[in-house]
Amino acid sequence: MKSLILIFSLALMTVSCGSQIYLEPTTLNSVVEKKEFDFNATKAFPTNYDVINVMNSMPGSTGTRILNLDPGYGFNLKKDLFSVALPYFGRAFSATPGDANNGGIRFESKDFRIKQSTTKKGNTLFVITTVDQRESYVFNLEIFKNGSAFLSVSSNNRQPISFDGNLSAAK
């Protein structure tokens, strides 16, 4: 019975989230065509079970694997600059020297590759690969027709992490 209620709740949340429009279709088509937009992350989905166990052990935890994020996280994509400021919850495979206070995935790249395709459902898929960073990153961004988006970030030094969010016109 609990699993039936859980499935019904997830289906209801999916339907209610899918009907909200984050960016008008004409604006969405324009920013996707120009490849100049902002991705605003609203939720993080860590894959590391150590992080999930810590989250579940905290007082008031609901046993979820989703972290709601404060505004200000995401990335800005322009023709000549890819600026990223995302939190990171997970394990790095090797220690990298740098500022310990500058956690997360934060960098600016001027040398990056973009591959654009369309999924079977008609969504746009961007694969953005950095070239000029010490740690190579691959960003898989699926953009839905209502302006919402799902981002998966993988690296040669960290466990993957995913984010849910929406697009806006580049500032």
Predicted feature descriptions by range:
Residues 13-16:
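C-terminal motif of bacterial Sec signal peptides marking the signal peptidase cleavage site
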Residues 23-32, 110-171:
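Helix-rich interaction surfaces within compact, conserved domain-sized segments
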Residues 26-44:
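Post-signal peptide N-terminal segment of mature Sec-exported envelope proteins
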Residues 36, 81-83, 148:
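Structural motif
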Residues 38-68:
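Post-signal-peptide N-terminal segment of Sec-exported extracytoplasmic proteins
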